[in-house]
Swiss-Prot record:
Entry cofactors: Mg(2+); Zn(2+)
The name this protein goes by in its record: DNA-directed RNA polymerase subunit gamma
Native source organism of the sequence: Synechococcus sp. (strain CC9605)
Residues that bind Mg(2+): 471, 473, 475
Binding-site residues, Zn(2+): 74, 76, 89, 92
Gene expressing this chain: rpoC1
GO molecular function terms noted in the UniProt entry: DNA binding; DNA-directed RNA polymerase activity; magnesium ion binding; zinc ion binding
Amino acid sequence: MTNSNLRTENHFDYVKITLASPDRVMEWGQRTLPNGQVVGEVTKPETINYRTLKPEMDGLFCEKIFGPSKDWECHCGKYKRVRHRGIVCERCGVEVTESRVRRHRMGFIKLAAPVSHVWYLKGIPSYVAILLDMPLRDVEQIVYFNCYVVLDPGDHKDLKYKQLLTEDEWLEIEDEIYAEDSEIENEPVVGIGAEALKQLLEDLTLDEVAEQLREEINGSKGQKRAKLIKRLRVIDNFIATNARPEWMVLDVIPVIPPDLRPMVQLDGGRFATSDLNDLYRRVINRNNRLARLQEILAPEIIVRNEKRMLQEAVDALIDNGRRGRTVVGANNRPLKSLSDIIEGKQGRFRQNLLGKRVDYSGRSVIVVGPKLKMHQCGLPKEMAIELFQPFVIHRLIRQNIVNNIKAAKKLIQRADDEVMQVLQEVIEGHPILLNRAPTLHRLGIQAFEPKLVDGRAIQLHPLVCPAFNADFDGDQMAVHVPLAIEAQTEARMLMLASNNILSPATGEPIITPSQDMVLGSYYLTALQPGASKPDFGDRSCTFAGLEDVIHAFEDNRIGLHDWVWVRFNGEVQDDEELDAPSKSESLSDGTRIEEWSYRRDRFDEDGALISRYILTTVGRVVMNHTIIDAVAAA
């Protein structure tokens, strides 16, 4: 038993893009119905009937070709409901199935005359011109009906294979051939348009040409050799992919599924449609007109003009504006062709396939978070609850706060204190990734420990800004949540901001203080010119430890740049270390006091240090105390 809803996994090694043969293009769009009828060819330019709003049969939205527009319902309405699955309606010929088949079922247009593919003709390099070993200008003259090309010189002594002839030149040769005294028995054959191009490409025997080119390459050098190698490379690629050169000339055009070029009704009763429908309509109209002209044996000049117009219509469909005048729609806007949909920044590959939105991600503006540690970032509660929702739901159920997922989601929507408590537990030790586009080197995406913050902006430590090339003038950053334990471990071990201090490019530190940080550090440690230094023992300016200085500063008893005497048990390095003290005094208890400009030491009888006071500013005490705390915490 097969079920269309089941996905079958096909494992493959690679995807190969090659030229499609006309038979392959017809295979894509052609289907045989159970009643034996073959469908797939789009023959009418109509889209929908504006009275019934149903797709026209054999048109660009035909339900017989592409499938029903409503689930389990045929065009005429005879069959409705899923129980008729797979039945083909006898009246309208529509298969009863799901409407989503209209996203992948293709059709085709059988052309009344071959047309050249504009990519291979006008691309850089032009593969048609390289294969035929002709200048691109000459090939264009043939394709767009400006010149004839000699396909077979026959017995004519002045003609050569692939020689170009103007209209007048060919008329003269015709007069010569059909003259009564003509000695030409084997008449020369000439062609024009994509048909002639197809004939020239069919005449190429790739293996023989490749062999001949290899021999010529051995005996040539310089520019000529480079040109021969270029041609040989193209021919070898054709041989390797089993593609024929004449497939670059189209006999059949695929019609992409209708749901990929939709037509939607607007509020006022008007319709908005994809540009592709207009381009396909032009091709079908011109193709039908050409077929009718050929049927009634119209004059050659009229048929030729119609063939040229068909060529231009197909060019516009494949790549509008590549050659000739750009086809425009309403208000002179160029119509978007198949190439425009694929290529560029907004194209299918870069926008939709490479630039997909992923689950468990979000983005917001960044603001500075000076109180954060370097490996932390501030994550808005609103974002965190959304990103970590599955983890929160799991924990709520496990802790018996709720019984099911539905109840958990309701609780989360209310943002109760219980939920916030659980969220705090969930994010504890769960790193997140921050990315700033463009990610030009590996430090453009780093891991951080999230801290819940109010507001809607992500808080970032200022020291990691150089790595991201970020500033706080409106930059946005993306957040990603690593889900697997392996991913979380890797993020913590390899990607944590505090583990990425050196630049991978130069090996120099990339985490360097700048701007406000440098200015703040300078201001904190600067000496105020002309400030008076207190005497040792002045109770308002002498302190027993660094903490006492900071408490006095916080209580506004002293200013940031005031001089203070503070007891300090650590090592002190200064320029006066080697000089003799400015004052040395022995006390009655056997101890000795030595004084320098910025230091006062007291030693016991054995010369061991009892106490040390240093003269410094409050700002320098704050700086030193902060560094000691940070080192101790690490």
